[in-house]
A protein has these predicted regions:
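Short linear sequence elements within intrinsically disordered, low-complexity coil regions
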Residues: 7-8, 25-26, 59, 119
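Bacterial N-terminal signal peptides
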Residues: 23-32
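Short stretches within intrinsically disordered, low-complexity N-terminal or propeptide regions
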Residues: 16-18, 34-36, 83
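Extracellular, repeat-based ectodomains that mediate carbohydrate processing or recognition
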Residues: 38-237
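Generic detector of N-terminal low-structure segments
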Residues: 4-5, 22, 38
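N-terminal secretory signal peptides that target proteins for export/translocation
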Residues: 1-18
Length: 237
């Protein structure tokens, strides 16, 4: 509707420069495209319970069946942290790899908290559908100095994208927004859209320090770290 209204207005004003018409139209289309892309990723809906993903790895020809398997909603050991205690609001915020009622091997990224005063947990927020059954894609969590909750959605390798989300309000899990994060590469800002085995730490008055694995950075698997004061623009690896 906004696009159509502006088209009508420009038609009524023949004296307006043609270049301005094009700029306005392109700007609206780009904004709509970005919003659509975010809406397809960020769900911001509520679940009616807690269901962690079940996952198995490397079938074996023995009585053990798999190298490992079971409920792996907070897998793996390299991912940190899954929970952050915030004394300011007396709550511990946490994330985990959830799943749907229909399929316990479909990975959904979930966010919630434990209220230490009331000793209860709310209905968790469904952040996004990772479109995989691989628990290596489980998320990790961080909380910045202003109380905003950050979720880093990892990927196992390069076949799937990674995402960074931030809560719209401090200490609140009801709504998250996709962060258009970038990092320095050869003096230019490039999109951050893939990372594995992520660890995210927020330091007072300094911001984020993150450690992770990146595939294809001069080796099959490279260990790296990046920093950021705001979570949007990140340093070079």
């Amino acid at each position: 509707m906004f696009f159509l209204k502006n088209l009508k207005r420009t038609r009524r004003n023949p004296a307006a420069p043609r270049q301005n018409h094009l700029t306005l139209t392109v700007g609206i289309l780009l904004t709509a495209s970005a919003s659509f892309a975010e809406d397809r990723i960020t769900l911001n809906t509520k679940d009616d319970g807690y269901r962690g993903i079940w996952y198995m790895n490397r079938p074996l020809k023995s009585v053990y069946k798999y190298k490992y398997s079971g409920g792996l909603g907070t897998y793996c050991a390299k991912h940190k942290p899954f929970a952050v205690c915030c004394d300011t609001v007396n709550k511990t915020f946490f994330c985990y790899g959830g799943t749907s009622k229909a399929n316990n091997r479909s990975l959904i990224h979930m966010v919630s908290y434990y209220d230490h005063e009331k000793k209860v947990v709310p209905r968790p927020t469904i952040l996004l559908d990772k479109k995989t059954g691989d628990a290596h894609d489980n998320p990790v969590i961080s909380v910045d100095a202003k109380g905003h909750i950050w979720i880093f959605s990892t990927s196992h390798g390069t076949d799937r994208p990674s995402y960074i989300h931030r809560s719209r309000k401090p200490y609140d899990i009801d709504a998250f927004e996709l962060v258009p994060a970038t990092r320095l590469q050869d003096g230019n800002q490039v999109a951050i859209n893939n990372f594995s085995y992520f660890q995210a730490w927020n330091l007072p008055q300094k911001g984020f320090v993150c450690f992770f694995t990146k595939y294809g950075w001069g080796a099959d698997r490279a260990l790296a770290f990046i920093t950021s004061s705001d979570g949007v623009e990140w340093s070079e690896r």
